[in-house]
């Protein structure tokens, strides 16, 4: 069985930490990866508008990605983090439904 890869988390991949030009120069941006959270998203509840939190899917898992993703703005607790949780939806493989 082939491996599937999801990369997610706070990557500081925006604003002062990484410009769009720097991000676009990364090989992972030019390859067969899907960046779920767009560059113009705001994943923090600070006064900045930065997409620090990212979800990146490899080509194999991208085929199961429904296109639905979001930022859970209801879950904000600054004692834990200054970031909102990000989420995405995958289709369940039909072969796993018969088990």
Could you describe each region identified by the protein language model?
Residues 1-6, 13-99:
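Metal-dependent phosphoester-hydrolase catalytic domains
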């Amino acid at each position: 069985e082939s491996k599937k890869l999801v990369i997610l988390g706070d990557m500081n991949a925006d604003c002062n930490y990484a410009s769009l030009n720097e991000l676009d120069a990364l090989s992972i941006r030019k390859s067969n990866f899907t960046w779920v959270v767009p560059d113009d998203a705001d994943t923090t509840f600070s006064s900045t508008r930065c997409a620090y939190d990212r979800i990146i899917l490899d080509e194999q898992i991208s085929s199961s990605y429904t296109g639905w993703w979001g930022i859970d703005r209801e879950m904000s607790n600054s004692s834990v983090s200054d970031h909102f949780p990000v989420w995405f939806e995958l289709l369940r493989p039909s072969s796993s439904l018969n088990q």
